[in-house]
Amino acid sequence: MFSKLTEAQKQFFETGRTRDLAFRICQLQLLADAMRKNETVLEEALKKDLGKSAFESYATEIGFVLADIRYTIQNLQKWSAPKRVRTPLYLFPGKSKIQKEPYGSVLILGPYNYPVQLLAEPLIGAIAAGNCAVLKPSELTPHVSKAMYQIVHSTFKEEYIACVEGGAVSYTHLTLPTIR
């Protein structure tokens, strides 16, 4: 199963769609919309798993993620632009720049203490950078894990962003090969 998933993500990444700035911004907006739409579901899951109140859930998890998505969307064009750097004299008349490139596919393992925030924050970075991602929520927060699974699967295609559930045994099989 995991080899098929990683192969599908590799093929999707190689199409080059994830490198497009407009695509990345659109995907971040889709994530924000899904988080807003499922805010109550996430609050209930956090209450069941960790005993968090609705206020605490929003302040430390959901609202935090939504604010970071907004900030990322506002700054992504600037962050993605090539950065000019000094060219050594012996390379004159050449010009040098740093061009940021996506890695390919990212594995994000979620902890139990802030299960939404610490799963979604790296996902925001992965999407912004132009990567595909596999999310593995903590098995110690089963309600949040189920909610995140549903959010991811209803929002993204599996060959782009996937979410897998299960215990420690499942993530030992989730080693991702380097796409490049």
Stretch-by-stretch model annotation:
Residues 1-97:
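N-terminal Rossmann-like NAD(P)+-binding subdomain of aldehyde/semialdehyde dehydrogenases
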Residues 89-174, 180:
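Rossmann-like NAD(P) dinucleotide-binding subdomain of oxidoreductase/dehydrogenase enzymes
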